[in-house]
Amino acid sequence: ELIFRLVYDQAGCRKPIKRLWISSMEESAIREGFENLQPGSDYDNLYHSALCRQRADWLVGLNGTRLFTVLYGGKVLKVGRVQTPTLAMLVEREEKIRNFRKEPYYTAHILAGGMDAATEKIAEKVQAESIAAASEGKTATVVSVTKEKKTVQPPKLYDLTTLQRDANRIFGFTAKQTLEYTQSLYEKKLVTYPRTDSQYLSDDMEDTARNVIGAVYKAILFEEPSGAEPDVRRVMDSKKVTDHHAIIPTMEIAKADLATVPEGEMRILSLAANRLLCATGEKHEYETVRAELDCGGAVFSVSGKSVIRNGWKDFEAALKRSYKTTEDKEKEDRKLPELSEGMVFEGVRTNVTEHFTQPPKHFTEDSLLSAMERAGAEDMGDDVERKGLGTPATRADVIEKLVKDGFVKREKKQMLPTEDGVKLITVLPDVVKSPQLTADWENALTLVAKGEYPMQAFMDGITDLVNGLVQTYHSISDEQKSMFGGGAQEVFGKCPKCGGDVVKGKFGAYCKNKC
C-alpha cells in the first residue's frame, strides 16, 4: 500500500484509484479481484499506519545510529526501532546462560516389574543413597494409580512466522530463506500470499479448502486418506483474518509439474500442504498413567503414556518420514504394564542417579521468531490484535541485518550475540532497547491501521523520544569511547592551517578541527 501511495503522491496524481486486493496469483482469484475492486479510500488508514512505521524506523534509526556512533567513535553502532530490542533479547539470554551456576541433585530409583520408578529431586547425595539402601531387595507396593485421558487439538494453519519457525526447526532454513522460497512459490501460483499474520481462512472458503485438500492427496501424497472427513470449518473464521488469510497451497498444484520445483521450495510447499491436512484432521488422543509405589518407607513414582488415537499426528509423522530433518528427536512414549493399587513387586533393585540443573537454552531462529512475536504479550490484554516486535514480513530482514552488521552470529542452529553486540546493548539506554516499548508501538500502529488511533499522536511520541535521546546523551568519557575502538587518538603533529592536532583516521591523517 505504502509503495504505491508514495509514487502516487510524488507524481502529483489526483486521479481516483481502485484497489485490487487478492491473496493468490491464480487466474480465478485475480479475475474475482478485478470484478470486486475496492475504493482506494478504504485503505487510507492502512497507508497512514505504513507511513508511520516508515517514518518511525527512519527517525529512530537515523538519529540513534548517528548519535551513538559519534559518541563512541570507531565502529558504526546501528540502532533500530525493532532490531535493537531483538538484539537486547539475545544479549539478555546470553547473560543468563553465562551467569548460570549448575547445581547437582539426585534421585533414588527402584527397578520393579520392568519399571524404573524414582523419588522426587533430592539435594544431598547421602540422603539419596540412604533411601536406595533402605529399599534394596525389599518389596514395593503400588499405593496409587492415576489415569487421565488427554487431547491435543490440531494445529492452526500457517502464518508467515509459524511457517518460518517450523522450517527452521525441521529443515534448518533461516527465516529469510523461508520467505524467499515462499515468495517464489507464490509467484508460481502454488501457494497463497506469504506475508500474512493470520492463521485462519475466511468463512467463504470452505469449498476452496476441500478442493485443495483433494489436490494435496493427489499431488503431494504423504499417506493414504484415513477415511475421516476433513473438518475444514475448524480453520475458518473471518473475524480472525486480517489483511490476508493463512498460507495454504493453491489448486495449481494439481496442474503443475512439481518435479521441476527446486528442493527448498518443495519442502516449504510440503510443509504448507501437510499443515492443511493436520489442521483439518482429527484430534490426537492419549492416556497418561502415573503410579506411586511405597518401598522401604519411601515413595517412588513412575509415569507412562499410551496413544489412543494418533489423529492429525499421522500426517506430521508422514512428513518427517518423507524428509531428512534437523529437528531434535522426541522421546519415545513409555507404556507401563497394567497396574492396580495393592500390587506388589518382590526383591526390587535400586540405584542412585546424579543430575544437574540446566541453564536456559540459546535462541535458535525458531525460538527467536517466537520471542519476537510474543514480546510484550504478557502486559497486553487478550483483545490486543498485534503483539511483538516487527511484522511477519520484516522479522527475517531484522535478523539478517543483525548478522550482517556483526552484532549476531550463527553457530549451527544457535543465534548468539557477538562481543560487539553485547557491548552495544550495554551502552544503549533502556528506552531504545525495550521489547515492551516496541511492542506497544506495534500495537499503536495496528490501531492507526484500524482508524482507532491518530497518526499524528503516534509520530509525536516518536519525535519526543528521539529529541529526548539527543538531549540526554551528548558526551561520554574516553574510557567509554574505547569500547568500540574510539577514544583518545595519537597526535601526529599540528595542522599548518589552524594549528590544531593532526590525528590518523580510517582513511588517513586529518585535522581534528576539520578546518
Set out the residue ranges of the language-model regions:
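Functional cation/ligand-contacting sites centered on basic and imidazole/sulfhydryl donors
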Residues: Y72, D464-C515
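Short loop/turn hinge sites at secondary-structure boundaries
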Residues: G137, L447-M455
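Short, amphipathic alpha-helical interaction segments positioned at domain boundaries
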Residues: A209-E223, G421-K450
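Short amphipathic C-terminal alpha-helix that caps PH/PH-like domains
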Residues: S135, A272-A273, I462-L469
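Short, flexible/disordered secondary-structure transition segments
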Residues: K283-H284, D379, M455-Q456, Y473-Q480
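Toprim catalytic domain recognition across nucleic-acid enzymes
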Residues: E1-E373, G381-K387, A393-F407, K412-Q414, ...
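Intrinsically disordered, low-complexity terminal tails
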Residues: I170, Q456-D460
